[in-house]
Amino acid sequence: MKSLVLLAILAALAVVTLCYESHESMESYELNPFINRRNANIFISPQQRWRAKVQERIRERSKPVHELNREACDDYRLCERYAMVYGYNAAYNRYFRERRGAK
């Protein structure tokens, strides 16, 4: 009987210890944690923003071949359905490579 009471007390202590809710885990105590766009843009300097835009434009111009093929396949519904089953490479080869060879 004593061991059962001791086990119950230990279990209660374990529950209290493990289920303790820490206030440190709360995201924010602030009333309004969001900031407006003007203040948010202060974090990134104009030069970094310009550099990011230039890099994005370069990536748009020089896309990999498989990405261009996938975009072409996404525009054609039958190719897109075929790609869901067999993959984009097989779908592109079926619907677009044959047309190039026929020319």
Swiss-Prot record:
> Which residue range or ranges hold the Gla domain?
51-97
Q: Which GO terms describe its cellular component?
A: extracellular matrix; extracellular region
Provide the leader sequence positions. Answer: 1-19
Q: Biological process GO annotation list?
A: cartilage development; cell differentiation; ossification; regulation of bone mineralization
Q: Which residues are the propeptide, according to the record?
A: 97-103
Q: To which protein family does this belong?
A: Belongs to the osteocalcin/matrix Gla protein family.
Descriptive protein name: Matrix Gla protein
**Disulphide connectivity of cysteines:** 73-79
Q: What does this protein do?
A: Associates with the organic matrix of bone and cartilage. Thought to act as an inhibitor of bone formation.
Its PTM note reads: Requires vitamin K-dependent gamma-carboxylation for its function.
GO molecular function terms listed in the Swiss-Prot or TrEMBL record: calcium ion binding
Recorded hits in PANTHER family, A to Z, give:
MATRIX GLA PROTEIN
Q: Where in the cell is it found?
A: Secreted
Whose protein is this, by species? Pongo abelii
The record's keywords, sorted A to Z, are:
Chondrogenesis, Developmental protein, Differentiation, Disulfide bond, Gamma-carboxyglutamic acid, Osteogenesis, Phosphoprotein, Secreted, Signal
Q: Which PROSITE patterns match?
A: GLA_1, GLA_2
The highest taxon in the source lineage is Eukaryota
4-carboxyglutamate sites (modified residues)? 21, 56, 60, 67, 71
Q: What is the lineage of its organism?
A: Eukaryota, Metazoa, Chordata, Craniata, Vertebrata
Q: Which positions bear Phosphoserine?
A: 22, 25, 28
The answer to keyword Kinase applying to this record is no
